[in-house]
């Protein structure tokens, strides 16, 4: 429909003790998303903040790396999602009250929006070695390996659900323009 595709997630702790609430989506976006367009017509914006430094095992070290000029554009004016091979983890920093990815097809003047809401505190962005076919803006409520990272729980999205508690969020994919 014209409101796009909504995904509502509800996690309820039916147990008798607190449980960690860890969730991420492995969302793949065809880019270009229109058959008459090319990868060169694509400009992506994502509400990323800082990039996490990763170990050789692809686990966060707890430190941050400087963003490249292209990554700065990824979070501001937009950049082609294939500017370099990406397998990066970032903090999420909402803009205008929203946390989302926007993929604009400059040929068609249309934008695919993936609005994940503000409950997702991290992004993982992977583009299959800059394949020019698809990329994956993956919202995460927590940092990868969060239970084993020695940082404040609020900084890495680590929280628990007490027995009977519910966590829920809604995300949406829609087209504008």
Model-derived segments and spans:
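Short, structured beta-strand/loop micro-motifs enriched in basic residues and often containing a Trp
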Residues: 145-154
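A short, structured loop/turn motif at beta-sheet edges
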Residues: 1-4, 15, 33, 105-107, ...
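Active-site/ligand-binding surface loops and adjacent short beta/alpha elements
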Residues: 18-20, 28-117
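Acidic, contiguous internal or C-terminal segments within carbohydrate-active enzymes
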Residues: 1-27
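Asparagine-centered strand-capping/turn motif at beta-strand->loop junctions
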Residues: 10-15, 127-128, 175
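Hydrophobic residues positioned within well-ordered beta-strands of beta-sheet architectures
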Residues: 7, 23, 99-101, 135, ...
């Amino acid at each position: 429909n014209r409101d796009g595709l909504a995904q509502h997630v509800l996690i309820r702790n039916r147990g008798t003790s607190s449980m960690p609430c860890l969730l991420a989506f492995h969302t793949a976006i065809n880019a270009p998303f229109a058959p008459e367009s090319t990868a060169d017509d694509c400009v992506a914006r994502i509400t990323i903040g800082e990039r996490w430094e990763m170990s050789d095992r692809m686990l966060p070290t707890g430190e941050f790396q400087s963003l490249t000029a292209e990554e700065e554009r990824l979070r501001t004016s937009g950049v082609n999602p294939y500017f370099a091979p990406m397998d990066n983890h970032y903090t999420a920093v909402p803009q205008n009250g929203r946390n989302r990815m926007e993929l604009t097809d400059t040929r068609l003047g249309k934008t695919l929006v993936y609005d994940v809401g503000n409950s997702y505190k991290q992004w993982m962005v992977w583009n299959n070695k800059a394949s020019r076919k698809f990329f994956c803006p993956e919202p995460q409520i927590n940092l990868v390996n969060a239970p084993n990272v020695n940082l404040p729980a609020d900084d890495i999205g680590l929280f628990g659900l007490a027995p009977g508690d519910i966590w829920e969020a809604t995300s949406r994919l829609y087209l504008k323009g």
